[in-house]
């Protein structure tokens, strides 16, 4: 089982803990292990997600008069961990982030096994 992963996210290196969606006492499933290995094999998905995340955040970022670094994605997003959903049919990994404009719900960048990227509040994967 992978407990942390070193990844380059939009030009910066991070070591992110990997959290698995499991009930108490339940073991990580084979599908979850396959999902994280598939994600490792397609790390380029992270770089490709940057424009999707920027588009999702654009309105809030542009209306923020206090943020002088609007062109720096890390001025409003901080990757915190990778979350591996327990789902045999559609294995997904989410990069869970702190989000300056929604501290309560944060932001999730969800990667499906087919490379599809979805962005939204963390509730979209939890």
How should each PLM-predicted stretch be described?
Residues 1-13, 17, 72, 76-126:
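Acidic, proline/glycine-rich low-complexity IDRs
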